[in-house]
Amino acid sequence: MTDQTTRLPVRRALISVSDKTGVVDFARELAALGVEILSTGGTFKLLREHGVDAVEVADYTGFPEMMDGRVKTLHPKIHGGILGRRDLDAAVMAEHGIQPIDLVAVNLYPFAATVARPGCTLAEAIENIDIGGPTMVRSAAKNHKDVAIVVNAADYAGVLESLKNGGLTYAQRFDLALRAFEHTAAYDGMIANYLGTIDQGAETLTTEGRAAFPRTFNSQFVKAQDMRYGENPHQQAAFYVETSPAEASVATARQLQGKELSYNNVADTDAALECVKSFVKPACVIVKHANPCGVAVVPEDEGGIRKAYDLAYATDSESAFGGIIAFNRELDGATARAIVERQFVEVIIAPSVSAEAREAVAAKANVRLLECGQWPAERADGLDFKRVNGGLLVQSRDIGMIAEADLKVVTRRAPTEREIHDLIFAWKVAKFVKSNAIVYARNRQTIGVGAGQMSRVNSARIAAIKAEHAGLEVAGAVMASDAFFPFRDGIDNAAKAGITAVIQPGGSMRDNEVIAAADEAGMAMVFTGMRHFRH
């Protein structure tokens, strides 16, 4: 059994990096510890320019770099020195003049950055597929019993500290090896994803000409947290995050206080945060079981998020119990105090949290308080996934949204300016409600939400019931539907409840009947031409 604590010193290191962050200082410290340094190409030149003594690999092997740098380190003196087992292969290594290499510091050609450049050709992408680098990384990782592999500049300091204390333990080398295999797996996955979108044989194809989805799908996520259980107590669970998230999200959020996030907390917080991101003016979203149960938008000069919270809570105070609350502005002390004094809440998330708000929430030690950072005004493209038994559904994110100019009035009466504002508000909310989704809204406040019903008319009925139960007036309110009305009954029910304007995608075979129902009731109706199913 391998000794987990015995420290192995480093006498010879090979350094060959594309990302040269911190490499000069790292090499200088190694040299100061008496480590002989081998290096290649640009890395060798950089070290020599900064006065770090190093031996160029071409001089060490007696073979020059060739083929425009395609062949640098693919030589038995390099790979024998890395792969050679010190206890079994010493005689063979000595016979062939192969010196052991105890540490390999390598990172790879910037393939992802290359293919992300507009106009990148297939030929350019191919030349940025690293061969020697991954080979050395995998060799060193395989032989981690005797060799340390470093693929991330963030690990330089820790490695140096260990070497100053006598060497790296087996446990450290094993961890570095695991990171190395994770690194090469992600790298190869990127290459496979890219090439899988290429029209075969198109040597001059650019990034813009690629298919939307590759032949095989490769993605890497890093475990951020083991969870007590999953959606239910009998299920095991963990939370994995992207290696480089594109924008502020629940995955990037910093927990300031409270109990550990549960599986359902993460899912519901994501739903709340993604919904509140839809609004430019100060907004509050309250979510329960992944559905918005209260949403409001209030301009800063009319009360901002403090007032928005009151209105969102008023939509459905029963469902808000034990919910998730998200804001698109800094959480202030007054709003935080109102929350903790009024209701039981699982999670509060905002771009930032004031010191006064932190103090207020601290009175409820179990409340999970998250700070996620600010997101850009333009939503980033990305992919959504849904696991099915034996497969994976992949689609582009639903970041589609409409503006007033996109609305098509289909009834005799056009909506008023107030109705238009409320229609667009309700439409943004409906996008985040489970289908079939109906949202009643008035003055940029939800007054009733009907979610997840198998028939659209029942979602409309539930929205009306919710509004009545909350004591909120429906007369003069608007209605949003995430998909078209297949029959006129949803419009008839809304008219009876007092709805005066409707927003929906349109596209039903019975659109004319639905429009006629709206005209009979004196309602305004607009089509968006965009559906927002959410399953």
UniProtKB/Swiss-Prot annotation:
Its EC number is 2.1.2.3, 3.5.4.10. The IMP cyclohydrolase activity resides in the N-terminal region. The keyword Signal does not apply. This is Bifunctional purine biosynthesis protein PurH. InterPro entries: AICAR_Tfase_dup_dom_sf, Cytidine_deaminase-like, MGS-like_dom, MGS-like_dom_sf, PurH-like. GO terms for biological process: 'de novo' IMP biosynthetic process. The lineage of its organism: Bacteria, Pseudomonadati, Pseudomonadota, Gammaproteobacteria, Pseudomonadales. GO terms for molecular function: IMP cyclohydrolase activity; phosphoribosylaminoimidazolecarboxamide formyltransferase activity. NCBIfam families: PRK00881.1, purH. It comes from Azotobacter vinelandii (strain DJ / ATCC BAA-1303). Belongs to the PurH family. It comes from the Bacteria. SMART domains: AICARFT_IMPCHas (SM00798), MGS (SM00851). GO terms for cellular component: cytosol. It catalyses: (6R)-10-formyltetrahydrofolate + 5-amino-1-(5-phospho-beta-D-ribosyl)imidazole-4-carboxamide = 5-formamido-1-(5-phospho-D-ribosyl)imidazole-4-carboxamide + (6S)-5,6,7,8-tetrahydrofolate; IMP + H2O = 5-formamido-1-(5-phospho-D-ribosyl)imidazole-4-carboxamide. Residues 6-151 form the MGS-like domain. Pathway: Purine metabolism; IMP biosynthesis via de novo pathway; 5-formamido-1-(5-phospho-D-ribosyl)imidazole-4-carboxamide from 5-amino-1-(5-phospho-D-ribosyl)imidazole-4-carboxamide (10-formyl THF route): step 1/1; Purine metabolism; IMP biosynthesis via de novo pathway; IMP from 5-formamido-1-(5-phospho-D-ribosyl)imidazole-4-carboxamide: step 1/1. Gene3D superfamilies: 3.40.140.20, Methylglyoxal synthase-like domain (3.40.50.1380). Pfam families: AICARFT_IMPCHas, MGS. PANTHER family: BIFUNCTIONAL PURINE BIOSYNTHESIS PROTEIN ATIC, BIFUNCTIONAL PURINE BIOSYNTHESIS PROTEIN PURH. Keywords: Hydrolase, Multifunctional enzyme, Purine biosynthesis, Transferase.
